[in-house]
């Protein structure tokens, strides 16, 4: 039965492959959303709760929404958020989460997943930022170095576009929702981190970088050296043991000019990644 289901899904995607229009990279990476739909009365003295989570396309939407509702975050950084893809119920996942959680949101596509959309609505998956506060200055940072994989020719996952980080400003803090390349080595991922650091504003403005880094080297990864040199601290380090809190972690939160401590929340039934929840407060003395 599973073979028949897999065959049927392959036929459906192949059909979509021939009818779905191809988007340009500019269209795929374009930022959209509702950045100022709501405004929560938040105190400036209250610590900020930030979540980063690769939601595996949002295919298990109800479970993802329930988990985020329990966490009650002020800012949410999402990776692999689908828009109008058959594999995730043709939802605009970030928009639907923002509505359900009563938050503002912006999203930028990473890849067009060819064959998962429709003739009138191509499927795009990418990074999103949700916030209880208005969102400003949102842009997609497309990495200069991409994997050498020929995604457009991959019969198992035909796609267009390239890896990006989504940057936005909300609540007086600059956020990056990051998804680094999985089909490459640590050297390429370190270069992608360098692209993010080149985009980080100069000065004392608080910055939080969170997401799926796809690293295999743990704290020894070359990308960490660049982040440390740029003044970023790793919120995922347990200061009591100085060891990463998650075993073999690939999801991280890094901060500059803001103090944060993060923990992993188990959510195996909602995604193939667990969400990371950080409590952050702005440094008063620089």
Regions found by a protein language model. Name each.
Residues 1-75, 83-84, 99, 104-286:
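Active-site regions of metal-assisted phosphoester/phosphodiester hydrolases
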Residues 95:
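Active-site phosphate/pyrophosphate- and oxyanion-stabilizing loops and adjacent acidic/basic residues
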Residues 88-89:
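Short, flexible, glycine-rich and Lys/Arg-enriched loop motifs at helix boundaries
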């Amino acid at each position: 039965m599973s073979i028949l289901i897999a065959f049927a899904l392959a036929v459906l995607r192949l059909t979509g492959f021939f009818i779905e229009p191809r988007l340009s990279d500019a269209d795929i990476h374009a930022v959209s959303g509702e950045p100022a739909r709501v405004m929560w009365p938040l105190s400036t003295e209250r610590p900020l709760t930030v979540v980063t989570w690769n939601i595996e396309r949002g295919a298990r939407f109800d479970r993802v929404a329930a988990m985020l509702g329990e966490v009650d975050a002020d800012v949410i950084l999402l990776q692999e958020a689908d828009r109008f893809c058959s594999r995730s119920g043709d939802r605009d996942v970030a928009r639907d989460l923002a509505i359900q959680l009563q938050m503002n949101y912006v999203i930028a596509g990473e890849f067009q997943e060819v064959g998962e959309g429709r003739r009138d609505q191509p499927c795009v998956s990418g990074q999103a930022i949700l916030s209880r506060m208005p969102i400003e200055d949102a842009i997609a940072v497309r990495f200069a170095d991409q994997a050498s994989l020929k995604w457009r020719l991959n019969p198992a996952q035909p796609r267009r576009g390239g890896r990006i980080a989504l940057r936005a400003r909300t609540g007086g803090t600059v956020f990056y929702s990051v998804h680094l390349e999985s089909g490459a080595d640590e050297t390429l991922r370190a270069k992608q981190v360098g692209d993010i650091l080149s985009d980080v504003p100069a000065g004392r403005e608080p910055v939080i970088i969170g997401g799926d880094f796809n690293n295999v080297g743990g704290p020894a990864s070359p990308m960490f050296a660049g982040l440390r040199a740029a003044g970023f601290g790793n919120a995922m380090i347990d200061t009591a043991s100085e060891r990463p809190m998650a075993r073999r972690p690939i999801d991280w939160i890094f901060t500059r000019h803001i103090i944060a401590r993060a923990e992993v929340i188990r959510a195996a039934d909602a995604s193939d990644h667990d969400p990371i929840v950080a409590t952050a407060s702005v440094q008063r003395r620089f």
